From Swiss-Prot:
One of its GO terms (biological process) is hydrogen sulfide biosynthetic process. The lineage of its organism: Bacteria, Pseudomonadati, Pseudomonadota, Gammaproteobacteria, Aeromonadales. The gene is cysD. Pathway: Sulfur metabolism; hydrogen sulfide biosynthesis; sulfite from sulfate: step 1/3. With CysN forms the ATP sulfurylase (ATPS) that catalyzes the adenylation of sulfate producing adenosine 5'-phosphosulfate (APS) and diphosphate, the first enzymatic step in sulfur assimilation pathway. APS synthesis involves the formation of a high-energy phosphoric-sulfuric acid anhydride bond driven by GTP hydrolysis by CysN coupled to ATP hydrolysis by CysD. It comes from the Bacteria. Disulfide bonds: none annotated. Pfam families: PAPS_reduct (PF01507). This is Sulfate adenylyltransferase subunit 2. GO terms for molecular function: ATP binding; sulfate adenylyltransferase (ATP) activity.
């Protein structure tokens, strides 16, 4: 079918499926990062479509920091069982031994050790030469300038000044031994595209995306959900039950909730049409310092 006859979402879907199939054909040992969020759910759905009725020909990898929302872990395990996924879960053993804690050590150190170093450990351990990620260009300025095929050196570092041209949807997959590519099939999607596609395709997502009464503590203007007993509650903290949901998901101490009454997908989509703020405003790791996301990516972060 001609691209001109496809709807906007059908064009995005076709492009993403093309990228996923290209990587599966060109690389020896690809892996799909699975962070359990809405973008990962869409990417997994696209991968299942790309190889239907066969199984996805590569494993999924979740780098678990040990601080994800309980509902995320439950959803991850249920999804893996439901679709018979080859799911690898990796936790940085050094970070666990050191007792790295986002409340004690801060978001920067926690992210570096449990996420960046944990990811590099897993990629080295299993020898993956390509890794899919669900990042989109509309999320954040460093991601806006990153290619679909993002080259990484032997230390998994990204050099934004040394990117390969991608003309006419032709991607350069050549890497030397020890080098790798991070692949972003959802690069050209927007947050609104993601939500509309989830609605049209009836894709399961973590319930945290829907508004519900949840216990939250407000710190520095950000509502943090009290997800387990590890969260320190000081005498100045007031735990309130509020109607909130999450636009983005990560480690619960580093992810802010938003006030919302959206309990259905159409209501979330309507909310997205009216919002003027970034979905990542609630991710504390993006506010460590100016340009923090680009610095993290240079060091090997996804």
């Amino acid at each position: 079918m001609d691209r001109e006859r496809l709807t906007h979402l059908q064009q995005l879907e076709a492009e993403s499926i093309h990228i996923i199939r290209e990587v599966a054909a060109e690389f020896e040992n690809p892996v799909m990062m699975y962070s359990i969020g809405k973008d990962s759910s869409v990417m997994l759905h696209l991968a299942r479509k790309a190889f239907y009725p066969g199984k996805i020909p590569f494993p999924l990898l979740h780098v678990d920091t040990d601080w994800k929302f309980k509902e995320m872990i439950k959803f991850r395990d249920e999804t893996a069982r439901k679709y018979g996924l080859d799911l690898i879960v990796h936790k940085n053993p050094d970070g666990l031994a050191m007792g790295i804690n986002p409340f004690v050590h801060g978001s920067g150190k926690h992210t570096d050790i449990m996420k960046t170093e944990g990811l590099k450990q897993a990629l080295n351990k299993y020898g993956f030469d390509a890794a899919f990620g669900g990042a989109r260009r509309d999320e954040e300025k460093s991601r806006a300038k990153e290619r679909v095929y993002s080259f990484r050196d032997k230390s998994h570092r990204w050099d934004p000044k040394n990117q390969r041209p991608e003309l006419w949807r032709v991607y350069n997959s050549q890497v030397n031994k020890g080098e790798s590519i991070r692949v972003f099939p959802l690069s050209n999607w927007t947050e609104l595209d993601i939500w509309q596609y989830i609605y049209l395709e009836n894709i399961d997502i973590v319930p945290l995306y829907f508004a519900a009464m949840r216990p939250v503590v407000e710190r520095n203007g950000i509502k943090i959900m009290v997800d387990d007993e590890r969260m320190p509650i000081g005498p100045e903290d007031e735990v309130k039950q509020e109607l909130v949901r999450f636009r983005t998901l990560g480690c619960y101490p580093l992810t802010g909730a938003i006030e919302s009454a959206a309990t259905t997908l159409p209501e979330i989509i309507e909310e997205m049409l009216l919002t003027t703020s970034s979905e990542r405003q609630g991710r504390l790791i993006d506010h460590d310092q100016a340009g923090s996301m680009e610095q993290k990516k240079r060091q090997g972060y996804f």
